[in-house]
């Protein structure tokens, strides 16, 4: 721990052009996977999930672990993230997609067949309610407020400074 003074016997040379800066696993033979397929997130809904090892684990200059530990932990992080994601999607993707589809269908049905007719009915009845409310206000509330206002208008307040 701390600032290392020994040299690691492992060296890694890499051109900037050959180094992939994405957070996925780099396969040894890129010819085996020539096309990654269409973009499955064209609107960038999950762009916040594009995390790399450096985004999660960061060691300041004053506290570096051994180089071999850093390299092994980086490799283990990337491999476990890749393998565990694939494993979880095999078992959870289809049931969760089904549940999301059912939920979306239920919410759409409720919105189309219950909520919108209720809102439209309220908007149809609202002008009648508005007319009745205006009449109640003019007949009951306006005279009441006027009489209370006249009563309090005759109240006088005198301040004396002693």
From Swiss-Prot:
Domain of life: Eukaryota
Bilayer topology: Peripheral membrane protein
PTM entry text: Phosphorylated on serine and tyrosine residues. CAV1 promotes phosphorylation on Ser-23 which then targets the complex to the plasma membrane, lipid rafts and caveolae. Phosphorylation on Tyr-19 is required for insulin-induced phosphorylation of MAPK1 and DNA binding of STAT3. Tyrosine phosphorylation is induced by both EGF and insulin.
Cytoplasmic-side positions: 1-86, 108-162
Sites of Phosphoserine modification: 20, 23
Chief location of this protein within or outside the cell: nucleus
PROSITE patterns: CAVEOLIN (PS01210)
Intramembrane spans: 87-107
Matches recorded under InterPro entries: Caveolin (IPR001612), Caveolin_CS (IPR018361)
Modified residues (Phosphotyrosine): 19
Gene Ontology molecular function terms on file: D1 dopamine receptor binding; molecular adaptor activity; protein kinase binding
Gene Ontology biological-process annotations: caveola assembly; endoplasmic reticulum organization; insulin receptor signaling pathway; mitochondrion organization; negative regulation of endothelial cell proliferation; positive regulation of dopamine receptor signaling pathway; regulation of cytosolic calcium ion concentration; skeletal muscle fiber development
Coiled-coil positions: none
Classification via Pfam families: Caveolin (PF01146)
Keywords for the protein's UniProt record, in alphabetical order: Cell membrane, Cytoplasm, Golgi apparatus, Membrane, Nucleus, Phosphoprotein
Subcellular localization: Nucleus; Cytoplasm; Golgi apparatus membrane; Cell membrane
Cellular component annotations (GO), alphabetically ordered: caveola; cytoplasmic vesicle; focal adhesion; Golgi membrane; nucleus; perinuclear region of cytoplasm; plasma membrane raft; sarcolemma
Similarity annotation: Belongs to the caveolin family.
Its job: May act as a scaffolding protein within caveolar membranes. Interacts directly with G-protein alpha subunits and can functionally regulate their activity. Acts as an accessory protein in conjunction with CAV1 in targeting to lipid rafts and driving caveolae formation. Positive regulator of cellular mitogenesis of the MAPK signaling pathway. Required for the insulin-stimulated nuclear translocation and activation of MAPK1 and STAT3, and the subsequent regulation of cell cycle progression.
Subunit architecture: Monomer or homodimer. Interacts with CAV1; the interaction forms a stable heterooligomeric complex that is required for targeting to lipid rafts and for caveolae formation. Tyrosine phosphorylated forms do not form heterooligomers with the Tyr-19-phosphorylated form existing as a monomer or dimer. Interacts (tyrosine phosphorylated form) with the SH2 domain-containing proteins, RASA1, NCK1 and SRC. Interacts (tyrosine phosphorylated form) with INSR.
Protein name: Caveolin-2
